[in-house]
């Protein structure tokens, strides 16, 4: 089992223009007995890998599934990180349950602001689109209505719920042909994020819905024809609609509030605690999710499977 210091050094190698890393939050650093390897499972490029070795000398049960009576595990997991293979998709960050890995350029707050702008442009729809799809559809969609990401696997459930709390009823994670994409593993991550978000929407009784699709919503289409005026959509959308603007101003404030609250939770207990343990913390995305749920109101007393 690698030492805590070894894990910290390995994760620090991930720090780049694409990713922010706080190794102290990694479950493998905080608990040597953890089996968490979500980042490695999500990574589509082989930048983060976990290999498992079974000791031939370690006693095993006949079915090979459990350690023998001594209770010791016969399997040793080894983490390996090759920063040169990082493609900056952000899927590992979306998979990380503790915020040990966080995306940059854009970070979550910038991405949420882009999504809020798209929400205003469409009047209730947020469409994220991967780089393959945006390249294929260039010129066919209004860029003000689409939030570009390298891979839709970078989107996590907290962002989807946050956008629903800001007024989005339709949230699309739009991708190209994932089978031919180097980020293909991101589609499964995106589908899981939508599944989790939709379970929350059902529990809270909201009409919002998130889905992975290969087509952008009709509201995102570019206005074609010789009479095209780049300001026409904005004019039609805002003319005489002060209430509409006020609602979206409130949504912007809600998004800013959620991220400010998440930032505040990170300023406490940064040092080692008196007991000698690492500081406890609320993962930023968890804080954002809690803020979004508060804005959505009370749940409909539905039990969620977690």
Identify what each model region corresponds to.
Residues 1-49, 55, 59-73, 123-136, ...:
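Ferredoxin-type iron-sulfur electron-transfer modules and their immediate structural context
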Residues 1-18, 24, 28, 56-74, ...:
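Flanking helices and flexible, charged tails adjoining ferredoxin-like Fe-S electron-transfer domains
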Residues 29, 82, 149-150, 183-187, ...:
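Hydrophobic alpha-helical scaffolding
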Residues 20, 37-54, 75-103:
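Cys/His-rich short segments
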């Amino acid at each position: 089992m690698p030492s805590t210091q070894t894990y910290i050094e390995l994760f620090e190698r991930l720090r780049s223009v694409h990713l922010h890393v706080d190794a102290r939050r990694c479950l493998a650093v905080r608990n040597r007995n953890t089996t968490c390897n979500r980042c490695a499972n999500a990574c589509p490029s082989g930048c983060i890998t976990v290999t498992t070795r079974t000791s031939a000398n370690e006693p095993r049960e006949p079915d090979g599934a459990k350690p023998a009576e001594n209770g010791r595990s016969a399997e040793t997991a080894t983490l390996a990180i090759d920063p040169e293979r990082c493609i900056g998709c952000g899927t590992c960050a979306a998979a990380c349950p503790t915020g040990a890995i966080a995306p940059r350029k854009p970070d979550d707050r910038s991405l949420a602001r882009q999504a809020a702008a798209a929400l205003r442009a469409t009047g209730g729809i947020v469409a994220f689109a991967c780089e393959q799809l945006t390249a294929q559809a260039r010129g066919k969609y209004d860029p003000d209505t689409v939030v570009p990401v390298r891979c839709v696997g970078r989107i996590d459930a907290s962002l989807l719920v946050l956008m629903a709390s800001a007024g989005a009823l339709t949230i699309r994670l739009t991708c190209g042909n994932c089978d031919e994409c180097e980020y293909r593993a991101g589609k499964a991550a995106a589908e899981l994020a939508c599944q989790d978000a939709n379970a929350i929407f059902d529990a809270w009784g909201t009409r919002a819905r998130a889905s992975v699709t290969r087509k952008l919503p009709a509201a995102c289409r570019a206005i074609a024809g010789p009479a095209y005026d780049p300001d026409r959509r904005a004019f039609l959308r805002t003319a005489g609609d002060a209430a509409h603007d006020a609602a979206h101003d409130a949504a912007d404030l809600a998004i800013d509030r959620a991220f400010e609250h998440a930032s505040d939770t990170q300023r406490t207990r940064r040092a080692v605690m008196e007991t000698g343990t690492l500081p406890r913390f609320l993962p930023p995305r968890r804080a954002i999710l809690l803020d979004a749920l508060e804005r959505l109101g009370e749940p409909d007393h539905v039990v969620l499977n977690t």
